[in-house]
């Protein structure tokens, strides 16, 4: 391991040693010896020792049901501790001093100056910078909140241990605390006993904001200001908010019957209660600090003549915030309200104006150093979080709106809306949107499904403008899908304009997105209400599941490119909303590389992107880590706008069209065309058992009785991740490249790798995926869990995988995967020693459970769940 990572290696060894001591104390030395023996055998097996591999298999297959849980837990917990150490490494002071990232804002500003980009252009681009991260509750965060708090505390201990001036006593005390935390984690059940409710998920999202983002946002703004002042002699305006947050948690009802209108209402109140509580804590600190006596005459005239004028203003705000916290607390506890709404804060401006006046007065009185302290941090938080804490997106599937309108049109005697032609639907919707009379009959009683749709729209109508950020239509296919939601909102009493966002998800829908938006922009009523602003969401998960990674990636690129060109032509300001997951099969990639691979001009109005599942913890879970993530996002957006990527050559486009078609055909010939694929998938992976894992609140299938096509993209990816074949992330992609090379296109493809960020990023993503696959482990799943007559399919897929790896290596002119990123290769190699036993244990556990499905052993079920979470920790990007 390189010298610069010696701190990481030492931390991993220390945490592993403490875990071993904990296990010995809790389970006895015999269990620890067994675990250590398995670890050594796994290490030797990875080194090619066949006898060690045979002994490893024999040892794991003969473990008693009683001992299998502590063994599984040991390897799972070590992988979690490794993740903590690796996450800390990114913010370690020693690491930052040694490794200056060329992807950072600081490096970008220096590069911009070196390339003589005008300072005015840089500053104006920074002023438009917007990073909007949308937190989602997708069921990929397998780590319980009870453990997350302990993991954060472990990280803090590692930070304190890094100080060189610690006394022996201080160092011993910190290490003892680490041992306590690891022991607490060991004695905590890592598997939830029941699925979280949407409200539980919302509490998890609120905790991320409270424990990390609340501090990270003003810290990042300070860091941005330092870079601007150092390089261009200016500072970012206090009025600007480069980072904002929205959430789907409590608003995303697509396929989740547990997210109701009442859920949304409750989550909105919870958010406001927590925001008031957090601002109250800030204001209390300000109240203690702002004992300053000098202020401007304007300030004194506005707020009165007081000895400590700022403290009086802040104390008034504190009194209102105390009542605001109490008011929303009573609502959450279903108590009758004792507080007048005139006495609470309901609008951001009520908090912003007096504090901004304090800020201005302090500046004008020569107290800039005071103004730019805690007060400035508070102002930044108002601009970012506001009194709603985060904006809430509403999401629902298009078919649900169609069914609701069909119910209405049938009742009023117009026939079945769902059976009408698209032109007729649009004509009806535009006529009703333009009409002053209501559409809904006064005495009509809708079905429960339609009632829920309408009640959700009424909840939206009750919110102040800006609290709900947008209404997203999943599986959007037509212009009428968008107009239908506008009509339902109008009928529910929404009087302000709420952006309605079509989400184009499948290959066909992405390809048709330009035509759909053209139709909408040509509707006079629509152009009149959108104020020349439009958001469109690009779906990564379902398009990749539908057509494979390569075809989906190209369809996403072309759709964005066409939408950018269309909106520029029509004079519409376009915001592209990226629905990415953490894995390659769901659009995931390192943030910086992913953004620089976007089409030119697609980021000029900022970035809006989902942060999903476990990626929220890895990228945003600690303040310093979140600041790093913001920095990477910001540098990539600014670089894309100031040093845009090249327009792809026509020859590159021709190759991509060919790769898209051939990769899609290869992918679908397996996933859809082979009659044995579904039974193979269900037996070769723990897909059926995954449904028992109490992860998120949302069911794993849209249709409980359906096949793979009804399976959501997340469990689809998760299942293949478990058996190390990782099929959705690569099937069809490299094979299509190989076919193109065989046709004589190698030189062009190598040129694309070198000069086109879109293509080189895809190749890099494939290389990362391939480095995590394992054909021997995948075969082991087949030989023990799959019927013999289906073995041919697994063998064929593994042969494809091996051929695909050779293709990628031939393009990179390397002998080994990830040779240009040796640390990642080493990290994967280290993890494999601990992940391999979990994979082998999982096979044994699945075999035992499937042999006796009517009477499953609870210990075996529990151990299986632990292997699933442990492998997820080992693979990092699970969904």
Swiss-Prot record:
Name recorded for this polypeptide: Phosphoenolpyruvate carboxylase
Organism of provenance: Histophilus somni (strain 129Pt) (Haemophilus somnus)
Active-site residues annotated for this sequence: 138, 545
One Pfam assignment: PEPcase
Tree of life domain: Bacteria
Gene Ontology biological-process entries: carbon fixation; oxaloacetate metabolic process; tricarboxylic acid cycle
Organism phylogeny: Bacteria, Pseudomonadati, Pseudomonadota, Gammaproteobacteria, Pasteurellales
Coiled coil ranges: none
Cross-referenced SUPFAM superfamilies: Phosphoenolpyruvate/pyruvate domain
